[in-house]
Swiss-Prot record:
The organism of origin for this protein: Anisomys imitator (Uneven-toothed rat)
Gene designation per UniProt: MT-CO2
Top-level taxon in the UniProt lineage: Eukaryota
SUPFAM superfamilies associated with the record: Cupredoxins (SSF49503), Cytochrome c oxidase subunit II-like, transmembrane region (SSF81464)
Catalytic activity from the UniProt record: 4 Fe(II)-[cytochrome c] + O2 + 8 H(+)(in) = 4 Fe(III)-[cytochrome c] + 2 H2O + 4 H(+)(out)
Keyword Transport (UniProt): yes
Mitochondrial matrix topological intervals: 46-59
Cofactor(s) the protein needs: Cu cation
UniProt topological domain (Mitochondrial intermembrane) ranges: 1-14, 88-227
Family: Belongs to the cytochrome c oxidase subunit 2 family.
Binding annotation for Cu cation A2: C196, E198, C200, H204
Name listed for the protein in its UniProt record: Cytochrome c oxidase subunit 2
PANTHER family: CYTOCHROME C OXIDASE SUBUNIT 2, CYTOCHROME C OXIDASE, SUBUNIT II
InterPro entries in UniProt: CcO_II (IPR045187), CcO_II-like_C (IPR002429), CcO_II_C (IPR034210), Copper_CuA (IPR001505), Cupredoxin (IPR008972), Cyt_c_oxidase_su2 (IPR014222), Cyt_c_oxidase_su2_TM_dom (IPR011759), Cyt_c_oxidase_su2_TM_sf (IPR036257)
């Protein structure tokens, strides 16, 4: 989860988020080098006494500043396309969970089980227990098995919402009349927090998401107790 005054991304918990973090660092380094080069050229132009006011044609320079940006864009595009394909790839999911956005709560249905569904509301500040997080705790957490591919089917009953869990690299729009899907895979157990990331009305800020990733045995015990 995010902390006050945090710099950088949240710790990666899924393979997709690890790839996104690496791509972020890769792109940031390219942007830093370009910015440094531009700043150096500007300082050079401001401090040098030499001028070339009569220069009308410089084909070598024009060739360089045409080819170089194209190469840089390719270096950014190739890893980006690879990650996009990885995010859309879903192979043999172990579990499917249907997520519906409402004003202003989430409802979940485990489609592989009969009658395993519930609504998830934010816990009001006055009802929080010591150690619980304001605006992030819910009355019903989404319990999922770790280290297994899980398919999330995401839609909405009313207006646009967005189901997002940053530490897992997830952000999928919930659109009325349309079913989007995403893959959830966690490398370790724990609680992972998210929020609705699409302005959806007056209580938009009060739609938290809490995923509880547990070992498979614990998940089986939980699902048996819920049915």
């Amino acid at each position: 989860m995010a902390y006050p005054f945090q710099l950088g991304l949240q710790d990666a918990t899924s393979p997709i988020m690890e790839e996104l973090t690496s791509f972020h660092d890769h792109t940031l380094m390219i942007v830093f080098l370009i910015s440094s080069l531009v700043l150096y050229i500007i300082l050079l132009m401001l401090t040098t006494k030499l001028t070339h006011t009569s220069t009308m044609d410089a084909q070598e320079v024009e060739t360089i500043w045409t080819i170089l940006p194209a190469v840089i864009l390719i270096l950014i595009a190739l890893p980006s396309l690879r990650i996009l394909y990885m995010m859309d790839e879903i192979n043999n999911p172990a579990l499917t969970v249907k997520t519906m956005g409402h004003q202003w709560y989430w409802s979940y249905e485990y489609t592989d089980y009969e009658d395993l569904c519930f609504d998830s509301y934010m816990i009001p500040t006055n009802d929080l227990k010591p150690g619980e997080l304001r605006l992030l705790e819910v009355d019903n957490r989404v319990v999922l098995p770790m280290e297994l591919p899980i398919r999330m089917l995401i839609s909405s009953e009313d207006v646009l919402h967005s189901w997002a869990v940053p530490s897992l690299g997830l952000k999928t729009d919930a659109i009325p009349g349309r079913l989007n899907q995403a893959t959830v895979t966690s490398n370790r157990p724990g609680l992972f927090y998210g929020q609705c990331s699409e302005i959806c009305g007056s209580n938009h800020s009060f739609m938290p998401i809490v995923l509880e990733m547990v070992p498979l045995k614990h998940f089986e015990n939980w699902s048996a107790s819920m049915i």
